[in-house]
Amino acid sequence: IRHLGIVGECNIQYAFNAETNDYRVIEVNARLSRSSALASKATGYPLAFVAAKIALGYTLDQIGEMGTPNSAYVAPQLDYLICKIPRWDLTKFVGVSREIGSSMKSVGEIMSIGRSFEEIIQKGLRMIGQGMHGFVGNDLHFDDLDRELSRPTDLRVFAIAEALENGYTIDRIFDLTKIDPWFLGKLKNIVDYKLKLSQYNKVEDIPADVLRQAKVLGFSDFQIARFVLDPQGNMEKENLMVRARRKELGILPAVKRINTVASEHPELTNYLYMTYAVEGYDVNYYKNEKSVVVLGSGAYRIGSSVEFDWCSVNAVQTARKLGYKSIMINYNPETVSTDYDMCDRLYFDELSFERVLLS
């Protein structure tokens, strides 16, 4: 950055060789971009606002409240993890290669927030909106696992799940994928816990600590129902059984706040997410107040893009004009609807029955 003489916002994409610690700069964007939006929403640091102030001649220590975590001079302190996953719509094209590389093939992306890698990868794979229930519990089978693991495709993560279930070691999967063993170890934790859940035949038999840990690891009620009850066909009844058992044990997600930097009223930050990994609510629910919940359209895809998101934005703006508290639930970091100053409360989380209807 110093060599290029850039003042303001800039993002750099580079390739890194973990074996030699060598890296190559692929791209430099000295402007606001989709990567900027992702970084801003992942950290709560308003890059566009700060870059505009710098362009006007302000210095970082003059933006926000100096000497506090609310100053633009202070790097954000994160107590959560973020996972970005692209959405590929490759099945909608005849003859297209499913292999992914340095050229962009995705049509959208999602961002999941949580307290562990296991949680955010499972949430993220559900958010993609292509019929997957998480890292495990999907009706996928690969005839040649070694080939699927050695080729980077949009389905390789699910090939890793099947490989772990079939007894592949982390070292063997690493040799085939070159994915860092740290990530493979976290994915193995999910598979191991799936096997633990499968030991129970009734929802009532699952101990409270086992069920709670399953939720901490990102398992949905749907996944737990599939592993414990092994239902066929319509799973609505079994899903509700797990939900009822979980609520009976008092296992509910906590609502946590992401503090934004350089905001005028940090204590009023409305940028929220849900997790089972901790207890306690950073905000209280709106009670006895008129409020409207708007469900976003999720990741961009072929046939649903920014025009649908703008419908959500118009909905929350209209609700506010009519005197209602506006609540947005969405998880697309590219969109205007997930800007935390567009509504009274933004829940950056899954658009699912389990998350939208907590009680």
Task: Kindly give the residue locations of the regions a language model identified.
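ATP-dependent carboxylate activation and anion-phosphoryl transfer catalytic cores
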Residues: I1-V210, A214-G218, E236-E238, E248-R257, ...
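Extended, domain-scale alpha-helical bundle/helix-rich regions
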Residues: Q213-L217, Q223-G233
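Glycine/threonine-rich flexible loop motifs
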Residues: R301-C311
